[in-house]
Amino acid sequence: MELMIESERLLLSLPEARLAPAALDFHLRNADHLAPWSPPRPAGFGTLAFWNEYVDKSQIAFLQGSVVRLWMREKSEPEQIIGSVGFSQIVRGPFCNAVLGYQIDQTFEGKGLMSEALRRGIKYVFAEQKLHRINANYRPENVRSGRLLARLGFHTDGFAPSYLFIDGNWRDHIQTSLINDAFRPEWLITS
């Protein structure tokens, strides 16, 4: 199964088996960088077997319509994963909603790549997955993430104390959302 979304500098694609070693490399390279923003890692997370299974599960979840996971790669280095964008907990019916998550390699921060990736990913899930709303939550101390979401048009919905177990403790989060102004009511029937 293939899904390729292109932007000016990036390729966004569903996880695929040939890139499983690159995904493992991304997470090993960025373990310390991502730890403050990540939930506990499952057993085997640092193994190729885990990432091969992750590919299979991601493709099944995509086919079921419950998750869209996208691996980020630069067009100039298409075999290296530099980040990921995920739309999970997709709910259809009268909700038509997903939860956004994202991460980027520490050496690629500050170059506008995540903003570029999120713009394309959001455009895809709004138009092709026919979603009405995307929720995104971030820790208050992650100021960069808050600024990124605001630039993308996300609005603050509220504050959630002890919301997620992240970096070894229950952490407060700021809840935000983005509404698809182009959503059409007939999508409720077809989604």
Features from the language model and the residues they span:
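A short helix-loop-beta-strand connector motif used in the catalytic cores of GNAT acetyltransferases and
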Residues: 43, 55-71
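Conserved GNAT-fold acetyl-CoA-binding loop/helix
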Residues: 33-56
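Acyl-donor (CoA/ACP) binding surface of acyl/acetyltransferases
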Residues: 1-22, 26-36, 69-191
